[in-house]
Amino acid sequence: MNIDSDIFKIQSNNVLPSRGKILISEPFLRDATFGRSVVLLIDHTEEGSMGLIINKQLPIFVNDIIKEFKYIENIPLYKGGPIATDTLFYLHTLADIPGAIPISKGLYLNGDFDEIKKYILQGNKVDRYIRFFLGYSGWESEQLSTELKENTWLVSKEENAYLMNGDTKDMWKQALEKLGSKYETWSRFPQVPTFN
C-alpha cells in the first residue's frame, strides 16, 4: 500500500496577511496559547502585527469583570492573546459606535465603551454582535513573516458571520476544512496523537 508522505507536510498557502484576515495555526503547534487557534489580524504593518485569538473561550464571563453586567445573561469572554491580559478588547458589528476602528466591512474593534455598555444594558442582542477578549496577540517587525515562512500559520479570509459566531468549539477545524481537501487531513488529526 502506498501512503502519501506529503499529507502531513506543513506548507503555507501563501496568502498574504493583512488586517481582517485570519491566521490558522498548523496542527502540530504545541503551544498552550496558540495551539489549534484562529487569530483575527487587527493590524499588520512593517512595524509588526496585532491580532485576537477568536476561538479560545475563558472560564469566566464579561459579567465577572464589568459590575454593571452582573444581573444580565452571561456574556462569554475570550482569550485574545498573551499580551496585556488585563485589558479588555471587543469586536463588534455596530457601525455607529464612536471611535470604533474598522477591521473589515461591517466589523469593528473597540470604540466608546460607554456606548457598548448602553447597547447591552438596553437588552440588545450580544451574541453575533459583540465579542469580548482579554489580551491580544502581537508580533514584532518581521516576526509573523518568519513564522509564515516556517509554515506555523495559514492565512485565510472569513465572513464576519463566521467570525462572530458564538460556537467556537470547532472553529479551527472548520477554518481548515474551508481551505479545501489539501487541509482536510490536518483538521482530523488528533490534538494529542498518543491518545488516539
UniProtKB/Swiss-Prot annotation:
It comes from the Bacteria. Pfam families: DUF179. InterPro entries: AlgH-like (IPR003774). GO terms for cellular component: cytosol. HAMAP family: UPF0301. Belongs to the UPF0301 (AlgH) family. This is UPF0301 protein BT_1078. It comes from Bacteroides thetaiotaomicron (strain ATCC 29148 / DSM 2079 / JCM 5827 / CCUG 10774 / NCTC 10582 / VPI-5482 / E50).
